[in-house]
Amino acid sequence: MADSLVHSLASSSQLEAFDSFEYAEELCTLGSEWIQEAGVLLNLTQNCVIVCLILFRRYCTLYPPRVPDLDAIVMACVSIGSKTTETPASVQDICNVVVYLKERFKDTNFEARGFIAHDLYSEEMYSSRNRLSNMELEVLRALNFDTHIVIPHKLAIHYLQTLQLIDNKKLLQITWNFLNDASRTRLCVLYPPFSLACGCIAMAARVIGMKLPKDWYRVFDTTKEEIDSLTSILENFYKTSAIAHKTLYLIFTEQVSA
C-alpha cells in the first residue's frame, strides 16, 4: 500500500511489554473515554478526536500509563491532536475539561458538588498548564515527532463507494460506530488503517445480515485472518469494558493499589 495509507504501528515486542504492566489496558480504555468526551465538550472535529485517540494509544503502548499521569497524557494528546488537525482548542479549556472529567470519574457525588473551572491565573491552572506542556514534549519525543495519522473512517467510505454500498445508510452508520470504538482500542496500533476499515465493514455487514462479495477485502490488501482477529478483539472490548470501568474506579479511589 502507499505510504499515505499507513502510519506507525506497534511491534509485537512493544505489545508484549505493554501487557506486562498491571492495569495498562484498563487505563488506556479510560483515557480514550476521556478523550472522546473532551472532544464533545471542546467541540473538536471527529477527525481531530480520532487523531488524539491514536496518538494517545501509540504513546501509551510505548510507555504504559500510571494513574497519576493519565490526565496529563490525555491533555497532551488532545493538545497535539488539535494542533495537528488545526482545530481550535485553548490550553486553558483543555486543562479544565480534563480536570473536570477526572474529578467526575473519581467522585460519585460530583454532580451534586459541582465543578468550578480554574481561572487562567490560578495556581491550579498554572500547575495544569505546566504538566500539559511537559507531557506534550515527552509524548512528541517518544513518537520521534511523528504525528502522521491516517483516519480509517475515510478509507471505509472509499471502500464502501468502491463496493457500491455507500447508499446503505445503516451499513455506513454501523461501520462508522465500529471504527469509533476501534480507535479506543489497541486495534489502531495493531493493524494498518486499511485493514481496520475492512474489519469494521465486515462486522457491520454481519450485524445487519448483509452478504458481501467473496474475498472483497483482498482488493484492499486485507486478509480473512486479519478480519477475524479484528472482530475478536473488538467483541472482547465490548464484553470487558464495563468490568474495566469498575476496576478503574477502585484504582482511582485507592481501594486497589496501582
Curated annotation (Swiss-Prot):
Domain Cyclin N-terminal: 16-148
Protein origin, superkingdom: Eukaryota
Major place of residence: cytoplasm
A GO BP annotation: positive regulation of transcription by RNA polymerase II
SUPFAM superfamilies in the cross-refs: Cyclin-like
GO molecular function annotation: cyclin-dependent protein serine/threonine kinase regulator activity
Protein name per the record: Uncharacterized cyclin-L1-like protein C1296.05c
